[in-house]
Amino acid sequence: MAFAPMGPEASFFDVLDRHRESLLAALRRGGREPPTGGSRLASSSEVLASIENIIQDIITSLARNEAPAFTIDNRSSWENIKFEDSVGLQMVSHCTTRKIKSDSPKSAQKFSLILKILSMIYKLVQSNTYATKRDIYYTDSQLFGNQTVVDNIINDISCMLKVSRRSLHILSTSKGLIAGNLRYIEEDGTKVNCTCGATAVAVPSNIQGIRNLVTDAKFVLIVEKDATFQRLLDDNFCNKLSPCIMITGKGVPDLNTRLLVKKLWDTFHVPVFTLVDADPHGIEIMCIYKYGSMSMSFEAHHLTVPAIRWLGLLPSDLKRLNVPKDSLIPLTKRDQMKLDSILRRPYVTCQPFWRKEMEIMADSKMKAEIQALTFLSSDYLSRVYLPNKLKFGGWI
């Protein structure tokens, strides 16, 4: 079904263009400060030297008949996090730490696992080869136990060495998808065209390696869920609202999806919007894209896009559109705890409109998925809701 008449193309994108001008003006007024701490893209020689220094410390401890230990920044405490509107959540420079002792029953196994993965990283960097987190796990799956153990240790090492995961020569398999008005060349020379069709393109596993990015997109739309993303593809949304770019992280975004969103913003400075469910989980996912997460706060400068705006689904939209009660879902106790947690986070104080939307949700004790809009029509999301939001500036 075609869109309702909206006047000439230029007038449709008028509000979007003004929004972009305001974003560019904000960048000119101050913009984002260059990284002063946290991780960075380090040279191979720097990474090798850092690992050698750690091993030297272990040898020195053993020579003194002392039990060696790793000192790891505590990535799970809000006390170690500071908030800056231009960066998001980032780790403070002098944060609290924890000791991973080799002679403690509670941490001896983790000490040995860190040492093993450090050894693997050293060999990867030295030989200029790469491995995925999954590859590392399967070198000894029984020893590691599960993939999460490997993931956490790699993040701890990245934080300990103050370098990015890419500098460790460790890649992660991407689960995200991208479609729309975007072309680029991958590190191996492969030319990729994301022109929207029936299928999308997988987010590359090496975002730093892609080059020659080209787009005419007026905006980037981050879609929380794969099902919604696929529905918009089926509805030919990218072509109907061309030029644009759509991305999904299929729920909580992986590192590569976040890196890609950041790269698109840094390269093109076009408005970036999120489309998430009107529930605490969707709001948290949006916050991860915009302000980052506590566990990855040491990489904030490489991952966050504070210019992101919340396009939908807003809790206030539910009443405005008369979404029937049988399409709404009661908040669970877990939902309420999550919502309370988000409301207490430092970035909410600078987002009064977000706070208002979350308070509407808390007061109603109801949530809704994007699919709730299908009560109006099966293609209401792509035909009416999103075009009107984008044309008339319905974001916060």
UniProtKB/Swiss-Prot annotation:
Metal-binding as UniProt keyword: yes
Q: What is this protein called?
A: Meiotic recombination protein SPO11
E.C. number: 5.6.2.2
Residue limits of the Topo IIA-type catalytic domain? Answer: 42-177
Q: Self-association or partners: how does it assemble?
A: Heterotetramer of SPO11 and 2 TOP6BL chains. Interacts with TOP6BL.
Report the enzyme's class at the first EC level. Answer: isomerase
Protein species of origin: Homo sapiens (Human)
Write the record's keywords in alphabetical order, separated by commas. Answer: DNA-binding, Isomerase, Magnesium, Meiosis, Metal-binding, Nucleus, Topoisomerase
Q: Which gene encodes it?
A: SPO11
Q: In which tissues is it expressed?
A: Highly expressed in testis.
**Cofactor(s) this protein requires:** Mg(2+)
Q: Where does Mg(2+) bind?
A: 224, 277
Could you give one GO CC term from the UniProt record? chromosome, telomeric region
